[in-house]
Every structure is written in structure tokens, then in C-alpha cells.
Amino acid sequence: MVRAARRKRASEDDLYRGCRMGQDCPIDIKNKYEHNTLADRILKWVSSFLYFGQLGISSGKGTGGSTGYTPLGGRGGGGVTSGKGANVVRPTVIVDALGPTGVPIDPAVPDSSIVPLLESSGGSTTLDATPGAEIEIIAEVHPPPVYEGPEVTIGDIEEPPILEVVPETHPTSRVRSTTSKHDNPAFTAYVASAQLPGETSASDNVYILHGFNGDFVGQADPEGDTIFEEIPLEEFGVPDMPPSTSTPTSSFRSVLNKFQRRLYNRKLVQQVKITNRNTFLKQPSQFVQWEFDNPAYVDDSLSLIFQQDLDEVSAAPDADFQDIVKLSRPVFTTKEGLVRLSRLGQRGTIKTRMACK
């Protein structure tokens, strides 16, 4: 029996590198390089409540750190320390300070430190002068430079300067207008254009005429006129006399009048004596607030509502009408051959059980 040759598996680094590239990855290689073995998972679970310090306990290759392994009993004979070799001590070299090089000074040469300045045109010039002789001085005068730019004219200082400003030209935007025309058979529009002498444009006037060039539907008489049929209108349930107010009299109104009669009880309603009857009949609002007559609008059949501010109560012309916020419409009652006109008012204050306002 021939035994099959056993092929050696690739190294762990090559297998994990191929695993990263998408090849088939052995589960033991993947867990070892990703620190997901059973020992690593136990350390992760136990480390949640235990702390091992810097012991370096794991399934990887341990080196003991930079100082190597140290036994628990201290440094003894059996301890192994891995690290770098001993440091070599080198002797210190003393460096001497070097100063600047000395420059010799010769005090025997009495040279003058004054250097004469001579103007020259580029060549060498030699000046020989004897003591006591006169020296001729020649001065060259050059003309001022000529300015070739535009001439600037300066006028009177008191006059204001005038600057010519040229406006910028902007391109005109294009405007497009669209007109739509729709025919309406309800009316016929007549458009007339009026042109005046010397005018280049015409103004359009639109006239809407009812019945202009219209078509009548129906029978016509021999003269061409349309025959219309007149239908009389019948009225149903129209009272003989129209109502005098916006709210007609009804059964509900009669019940309301009976209820208002109960309000004339002295225990529930305060009765106010009217001294000026003419004002109470024509314009009763003058008892509540200061105002002027408005002849354009007078309607005494409506309820009057006054806008009173609760924080600032103003004085009324009549003390009995103080703090009135509403006056009802006039209520007419007949008793013993007389006609009584009354208005029910409502105050804005609140009265408690202790009679405090």
C-alpha cells in the first residue's frame, strides 16, 4: 500500500493575508490573528471585573515588555532580563574657547582721517595745490527737467471744481408680452381707435354695450320685434305691514317680552329715573359716554354696546349710567292707556354677596 504524500500547509501569515483578500480562511487562523480565540474571549469576560495590570497575558507572543520578565519574589538568581546592552561611557573632551585674531596697530603713521571728495566724469583727476594759492571753483548749472505730460490748468480756488461724470450704459433687457383674446357671447365689445394729428400711436377705447348686435331667441312679430311673455308673480305669506325692525315680531318675541316685564321688579333690577326725556328717546348713548350727534346715521331701534376698559373706568355724563356696557333696544309696553318705553342696561362691574363692587 502506497502512502500518499502529505503536502505542507502554507504559513499562517500567508493564509491570513489570503483571508483578507477574500480567499477561504481557516477559522483557527482567523481567530488567532484577530484575537478571538477561547482564551481571548475568557480574558475579555474576566477583565470586566478583574484587572491584571501590565502582565501581558494573552494568546500572542509574549516579550515581557521592555524590562523583561521578573519573578514575583523579587530579583533573584533565577530571573531573566532581556533588554539592550550596557551603555559605554565616553570621556568628555574639553573645548577651548577661541577669540578673534589680534590686529596690530601702528601708532607711528600720523595719517589724516579726512578724505577729500572730488567730482569727476569717470576718469582719474589729480589736483595739485600749493600752500597759499587760489583755487578756481567752477559750478555747472543744469536746466530744470521738462515735463512732457498733459498740461494741468488750475483756476480760481474759490470756484467749485466741476467734474464730468459719464453715466454707464447698461444693456436693455428684452421684454416679451403675449395677448390672448377670448370671445364672450354675453356681450359684444366695440373697439374704436382715435388718432390725433401728429401722433404716431393710437389709443384703443373699449365700449361694452348691452344688446349691441345681439341675437334674440323666440318668436317675432311681423315688424321684427321679439314677442315676450309676461308672467305675473304671486306672493305667498307676505304680511300686510312690513316689519319695522330687523327682527320681526314672533311668538318667541312675545315670550321674551313677558320675561323682560319680570325684570322691572325692584328687587332684581335697579330703576333709574330719567330727567331728560328728549335725550333718552333720540340718543340715549349720551347718558353713558361723551359724544356728539351724528345726523348721518341715527337708529334708535338697535342695542347699544359700549367698549369700556375694566382697568380705566371713565366718568359718565350721568352718574346713574356709570359703568354701563350695554343698553338694549327700546321695549314698548302699554298699560292703563299709556305707552312705556324702556331700555335694559347691563353694568360691567361684579357685585358679590357682601354687596361689594
UniProtKB/Swiss-Prot annotation:
GO biological process, one term: microtubule-dependent intracellular transport of viral material towards nucleus
tRNA processing found in the keyword field: no
Ranges spanned by the short sequence motif Nuclear localization signal, renumbered to the chain: 1-10
Superkingdom of origin organism: Viruses
Keyword list, A-Z: Capsid protein, Cytoplasmic inwards viral transport, Disulfide bond, DNA-binding, Host endosome, Host Golgi apparatus, Host nucleus, Host-virus interaction, Late protein, Microtubular inwards viral transport, Phosphoprotein, Viral penetration into host nucleus, Virion, Virus entry into host cell
Broad class of the protein's primary localization: virion
Annotated InterPro entries: Late_L2 (IPR000784)
Location(s), subcellular: Virion; Host nucleus; Host early endosome; Host Golgi apparatus
Disulfide bridge map: 19-25
Quaternary structure and interacting proteins, as annotated: Interacts with major capsid protein L1. Interacts with E2; this interaction inhibits E2 transcriptional activity but not the DNA replication function E2. Interacts with host GADD45GIP1. Interacts with host HSPA8; this interaction is required for L2 nuclear translocation. Interacts with host importins KPNB2 and KPNB3. Forms a complex with importin alpha2-beta1 heterodimers via interaction with the importin alpha2 adapter. Interacts with host DYNLT1; this interaction is essential for virus intracellular transport during entry.
Family: Belongs to the papillomaviridae L2 protein family.
The protein's role, per its UniProt record: Minor protein of the capsid that localizes along the inner surface of the virion, within the central cavities beneath the L1 pentamers. Plays a role in capsid stabilization through interaction with the major capsid protein L1. Once the virion enters the host cell, L2 escorts the genomic DNA into the nucleus by promoting escape from the endosomal compartments and traffic through the host Golgi network.
UniProt-recorded name of the protein: Minor capsid protein L2
Taxon lineage: Viruses, Monodnaviria, Shotokuvirae, Cossaviricota, Papovaviricetes
Gene of this entry: L2
